[in-house]
């Protein structure tokens, strides 16, 4: 509602907890993995996605209908949370939701890079951040990566993307651009937070998110064997790595895995690290970090039940629900078995 005035966490948390009760659980996911796209859409119509399915049903069908409905519902849910919020609580939530601006920027860049149709790019956009419809439209109309950078010149992504663009032109790979977007988002997210205990705990959660992003980037670089300076992709704000330690560890996969296993995240990520060693599965590791963040958010929401943390915990859980449903729909479209699809889901 407004960043001015006093916060109202009691009211917002109560509304969010009511919404959380309608999220899909294990039983719903198991049912969905055994349905086709049309059945999934009908199932969604009988749940919290009914408004979106009905509104979009005459325009889209199959997996496209599911994806458009998911993204519209997600944006609507988060707009509601902002409408309920006031004061510093509004500011913290709005700042976190700008992650979807970062998502949209990277989605457009990837789409332009692969010469995807505008409609193919648009279906993956989530309009839950700060960017208005006009900027989203300008991004979708950009016909080159340089044009995308130009659209963003007056945002926090402008200067970092312009600097990274030179390296992109030299290498032809998107990693410098994508990491420039992530660094800009997280550095802004972690700046100027409050000093009360709940906010300090929230800051610890954000630092864990940065740690997991740095760990995934380091593992990706270590596995690639590419001659890339890992320090160039370091995101400030976490506690697990320094720029120097990330650069050193990313050159040796075994040392990096051991370092993460011996860290404060070892218990949560241990099984995924073993799978990474045995099956070379980075996806399993990334799923494990997602699950660990969900669990961490839930834990903080219990410790500080009247603060921003239960709200952020719900945002993560809702985002994960959307990703799970999307994975099921796309898996069905690709002809994957129920077991193969279930391996792609993050369920806590």
Swiss-Prot record:
Tell me what topology the record assigns in the membrane: Peripheral membrane protein
Q: Which InterPro entries match?
A: ATPase_csu/dsu_sf, ATPase_V0-cplx_csu, ATPase_V0-cplx_csu/dsu, V-ATPase_V0D/AC39_subunit, V-type_ATPase_csu/dsu, V-type_ATPase_csu/dsu_dom_3
Q: Name one GO biological process term.
A: proton motive force-driven plasma membrane ATP synthesis
Recorded superkingdom: Archaea
Q: Which Pfam families match?
A: vATP-synt_AC39
Which spans are transmembrane here? none
Location within or outside the cell:
Cell membrane
Gene Ontology molecular functions: ATP binding; proton-transporting ATP synthase activity, rotational mechanism; proton-transporting ATPase activity, rotational mechanism
What cellular component terms from Gene Ontology apply here? plasma membrane; proton-transporting V-type ATPase, V0 domain
Q: Which UniProt keywords apply?
A: ATP synthesis, Cell membrane, Hydrogen ion transport, Ion transport, Membrane, Transport
Alphabetized SUPFAM superfamilies for the sequence: V-type ATP synthase subunit C
UniProt lists the family membership as follows:
Belongs to the V-ATPase V0D/AC39 subunit family.
Q: How does it assemble?
A: Has multiple subunits with at least A(3), B(3), C, D, E, F, H, I and proteolipid K(x).
Functional summary from the UniProt entry: Component of the A-type ATP synthase that produces ATP from ADP in the presence of a proton gradient across the membrane.
Q: Which PANTHER family match?
A: V-TYPE ATP SYNTHASE SUBUNIT C
Q: What is this protein called?
A: A-type ATP synthase subunit C
Give the source lineage, highest ranks first: Archaea, Methanobacteriati, Methanobacteriota, Stenosarchaea group, Halobacteria
């Amino acid at each position: 509602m407004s960043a001015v005035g006093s916060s109202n966490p009691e009211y917002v948390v109560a509304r969010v907890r009511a919404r959380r009760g309608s999220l899909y659980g294990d039983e719903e996911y198991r049912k969905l993995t055994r349905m086709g796209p049309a059945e999934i859409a009908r199932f969604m119509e009988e749940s919290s996605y009914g408004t979106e399915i009905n509104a979009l049903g005459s325009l889209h069908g199959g997996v496209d209908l599911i994806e458009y409905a998911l993204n519209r519902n997600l944006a609507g849910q988060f707009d509601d949370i902002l409408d309920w919020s006031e004061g510093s609580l509004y500011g913290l939530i709005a700042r976190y939701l700008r992650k979807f601006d970062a998502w949209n920027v990277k989605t457009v860049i990837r789409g332009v890079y692969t010469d995807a149709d505008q409609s193919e790019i648009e279906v993956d956009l989530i309009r839950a951040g700060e960017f208005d419809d006009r900027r989203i439209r300008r991004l979708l109309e950009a016909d080159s990566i340089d044009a995308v950078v130009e659209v963003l010149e007056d945002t926090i992504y402008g200067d970092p993307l312009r600097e990274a663009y030179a390296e992109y032109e030299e290498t032809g790979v998107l990693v410098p651009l994508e990491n420039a977007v992530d660094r800009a988002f997280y550095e802004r997210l972690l700046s100027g937070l409050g000093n009360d205990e709940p906010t300090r705990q929230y800051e610890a959660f954000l630092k864990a998110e940065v740690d997991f992003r740095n760990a995934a980037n380091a593992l990706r670089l270590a596995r690639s064997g590419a001659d890339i300076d890992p320090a160039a992709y370091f995101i400030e704000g976490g506690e697990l790595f320094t720029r120097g330690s990330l650069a050193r560890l990313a050159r040796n996969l075994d040392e990096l895995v051991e370092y993460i296993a011996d860290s404060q995240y070892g218990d949560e990520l241990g099984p995924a690290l073993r799978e990474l060693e045995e099956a070379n599965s980075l996806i399993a590791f990334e799923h494990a970090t997602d699950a660990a963040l969900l669990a961490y958010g839930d834990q903080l929401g219990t410790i500080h039940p009247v603060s921003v943390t239960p709200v952020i915990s719900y945002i993560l859980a809702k985002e994960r629900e959307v990703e799970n449903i999307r994975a099921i729909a796309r898996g069905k479209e690709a002809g994957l078995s129920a077991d193969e699809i279930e391996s792609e889901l993050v369920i806590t």
